[in-house]
């Protein structure tokens, strides 16, 4: 059930057939991430969608940011506080996404529908475990702000990462489009409580760079 005045979390699970993949919010050199056009009840407000950490897939020299297996996108919805128990809340979305193998791509679309009822906000143990498993695949927020510097065709990114946290072959997935060359090699080194990633810059100089390490 859902509770008036609280935040409801929606989970959109994408189930993949073997050898098929879909794309992250920044798909990389090719592909398209999922798009959702929502219709929500009056007064409800949708927050930013939370994505799992993607995987790298290089095809014909092009870097793709993909999901090779089943995964879920999480979306917070603020529910109006003046709703009486028993109020019905219809949630609808028109979805479009691209599903690919290493040989073909198929544009997909679908209509999503969910009818909820305002109640006491109780969550079943099974649903809680399911959402906990999905949240475990999200990127964790940094303890501080990352820094970046562009020098000609090179980009250096300093990501806060405590020395006590191990990192094997880290890779920076840029959310900001056209800031780095996605398929270019990345060199990473630890300097104190930071992981320094150096790679090839691309496009015009950006004043903001976001991503996932």
Which role does the model predict for each range below?
Residues 1-213:
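Extracellular/lumen-exposed scaffold segments
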């Amino acid at each position: 059930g859902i509770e008036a005045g609280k935040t409801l979390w929606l989970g959109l699970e994408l189930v993949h057939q073997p050898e098929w993949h879909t794309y992250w919010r920044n798909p990389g050199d090719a592909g398209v991430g999922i798009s959702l056009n929502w219709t929500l009840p009056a007064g409800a407000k949708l927050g930013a969608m939370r994505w799992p950490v993607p995987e790298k897939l290089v095809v014909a020299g092009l870097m793709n940011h993909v999901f090779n297996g089943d995964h879920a996108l999480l979306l917070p919805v603020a529910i109006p506080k003046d709703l009486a128990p028993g109020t019905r809340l219809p949630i609808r979305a028109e979805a479009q996404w691209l599903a690919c193998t290493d040989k073909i791509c198929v544009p997909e679309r679908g209509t999503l529908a969910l009818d909820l009822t305002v109640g006491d906000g109780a969550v079943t143990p099974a649903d809680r475990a399911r959402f906990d498993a999905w949240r475990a695949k999200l990127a964790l927020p940094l303890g501080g702000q990352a820094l970046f510097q562009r020098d000609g065709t090179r980009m250096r990114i300093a990501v806060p990462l405590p020395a006590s946290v191990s990192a094997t072959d880290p890779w920076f997935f840029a959310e900001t489009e056209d800031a780095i060359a996605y398929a270019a090699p990345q060199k990473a080194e630890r300097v104190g409580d930071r992981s320094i990633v150096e790679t090839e810059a691309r496009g015009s100089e950006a004043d903001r760079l976001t991503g996932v390490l």
